[in-house]
């Protein structure tokens, strides 16, 4: 239909794309710039981690909460509130990462018939999957896997990598998706057990 507009852009977050689409003649607010900065894992703007920690604490999100947020030039008040939350979050992430173990996953690499076993680090983490996954990726040099059991007994997997390692190759094998440095899929408990042998 003529009413559909699709834009795929790996250099902008969905929040930034939506703002620019619906407000083409308006300066992008600092809040949206910070959301974009964190969503793409750039952290080029001071305070993005703190701001995200504050926003994550608002869950479950509602339109009333978003309407109450400041879209002013600075987000200084939100940074300050988020800084305390971020300190506590970082402690939790480090505690979770301390329980990681090696994970061995086979996935395609290069050609269709070229499969490799890759060793990374994995941990059960129902919270802070992105942060935990990135810490594990830094430690392993390949990938980090933050997983948890959902209410149906399926294993929700959040893969992260830093640099050139492509975690989407793993997720796609198991019916998931994502991009080079962040991907996810859902697998059975038996599959997870194979990865953690």
Please place each PLM-identified region on the residue numbering.
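Electropositive phosphate-/nucleotide-binding environments in soluble metabolic enzymes
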Residues: 12, 25, 29, 83, ...
């Amino acid at each position: 239909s003529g009413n559909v507009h699709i834009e795929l852009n790996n250099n902008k977050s969905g929040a930034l794309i939506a703002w620019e689409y619906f407000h083409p003649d308006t300066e992008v607010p600092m809040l949206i710039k910070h959301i974009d900065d964190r969503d793409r894992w750039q952290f080029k703007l001071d305070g993005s981690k703190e701001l995200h920690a504050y926003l994550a604490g608002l869950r479950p999100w509602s339109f009333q909460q978003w309407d109450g947020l400041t879209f002013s030039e600075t987000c200084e008040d939100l940074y300050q509130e988020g800084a305390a939350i971020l300190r506590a979050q970082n402690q939790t992430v480090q505690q979770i990462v301390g329980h990681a173990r090696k994970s061995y996953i086979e996935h395609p690499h290069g050609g269709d018939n070229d499969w490799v076993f890759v060793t990374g680090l994995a941990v059960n983490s129902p919270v802070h999957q992105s942060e935990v996954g990135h810490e594990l990726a830094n430690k392993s040099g390949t990938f980090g896997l933050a997983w948890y059991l959902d209410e149906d007994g399926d294993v929700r997997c959040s893969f992260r990598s830093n640099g050139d390692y492509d975690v989407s190759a793993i997720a796609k094998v198991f019916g998931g998706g994502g991009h080079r440095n962040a991907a996810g899929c859902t697998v059975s408990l038996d599959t997870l057990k194979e990865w953690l042998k």
